[in-house]
Amino acid sequence: MKNVGLRIDVDTWRGTRDGMPRLLELLAAQQIQATFFFSVGPDNMGRHLWRLAKPQFLLKMLRSRAASLYGWDILLAGTAWPGRKIGQGLAAQIRAAAADHEVGLHAWDHFAWQTWAGVWSERQLTEQIRLARDALTAIIERPVTCSAVAGWRADDRVVQAKQPFDFHYNSDCRGTEPFRPLLANGAFGAVQIPVTQPTFDEAIGQTTTRAGYNHFILDSIKADRGTPVYTIHAEVEGIALSGMFQELLSMAVAEGIRFCPLRELLPQDTAALPVGQVVRGEIPGREGWVGCQRLLK
């Protein structure tokens, strides 16, 4: 069996209320555990609409048929009214995931992090992490041990800002294998477990079709020579594409692929992991910069 980290990002109110419970049902049916990363503050995701002025983002939205994929309540959330606080209103749903799966911190305000993390001061970065960590800790009633920034918007500043929170690992970047990020002072930050596989919205219309997506992503996972990590979203695979994801889980079992929480990808001795940095870069199918793994010799 090939172990593949299954990361599930839960970004919005609707994804937490509707998509995530459906994913719990699908995973339970196959006896699969995963890692859920939750946004717990205001759902302002609709404010991303201004990015339609950027050609690359507009093309992505058209390729993925965003209106039917996400629904208008997600696409307009936080525009004409203040965004609802997800953790405050949907704590029971988050606790349901934490009962059987690894749960980590995604964001306080997903939109704000994805939009402003690149220019925020260290104080602002730290405050956003603290708000989310405190809220999620109160909900699940145990320490939060892992995190993954919204939209993979991470660099060395973000890695440093997370140090005081003592996460066991972070999944903030795209890359090939777990590594130890080198800090400016010569010390090592918490281990990073990069995402290695494209997401549905990155691949669709560029390298595959909706009908061929499951075969495409399984072939990509089987060809992965690093430590494969695959990300899905509660707003997509838990709602509009839940049937397709159900088929993917069955196909994966038949092809010898075992999905698992990200923590199971860590070796007992993390000191043996390679050393690297989280730097800004670009990946096909995604608008704007993301954190990328750069290994150091």
UniProtKB/Swiss-Prot annotation:
Belongs to the polysaccharide deacetylase family. ArnD deformylase subfamily. It catalyses: 4-deoxy-4-formamido-alpha-L-arabinopyranosyl di-trans,octa-cis-undecaprenyl phosphate + H2O = 4-amino-4-deoxy-alpha-L-arabinopyranosyl di-trans,octa-cis-undecaprenyl phosphate + formate. Residues 2-260 form the NodB homology domain. GO terms for biological process: 4-amino-4-deoxy-alpha-L-arabinopyranosyl undecaprenyl phosphate biosynthetic process; lipid A biosynthetic process; lipopolysaccharide biosynthetic process; response to antibiotic. Pathway: Glycolipid biosynthesis; 4-amino-4-deoxy-alpha-L-arabinose undecaprenyl phosphate biosynthesis; 4-amino-4-deoxy-alpha-L-arabinose undecaprenyl phosphate from UDP-4-deoxy-4-formamido-beta-L-arabinose and undecaprenyl phosphate: step 2/2; Bacterial outer membrane biogenesis; lipopolysaccharide biosynthesis. InterPro entries: ArnD, Glyco_hydro/deAcase_b/a-brl, NODB_dom, Polysacc_deacetylase_ArnD. This is Probable 4-deoxy-4-formamido-L-arabinose-phosphoundecaprenol deformylase ArnD. Keywords: Antibiotic resistance, Hydrolase, Lipid A biosynthesis, Lipid biosynthesis, Lipid metabolism, Lipopolysaccharide biosynthesis. Its EC number is 3.5.1.n3. Catalyzes the deformylation of 4-deoxy-4-formamido-L-arabinose-phosphoundecaprenol to 4-amino-4-deoxy-L-arabinose-phosphoundecaprenol. The modified arabinose is attached to lipid A and is required for resistance to polymyxin and cationic antimicrobial peptides. PROSITE patterns: NODB (PS51677). GO terms for molecular function: hydrolase activity, acting on carbon-nitrogen (but not peptide) bonds, in linear amides. GO terms for cellular component: membrane. It is an enzyme of class 3 (hydrolase).
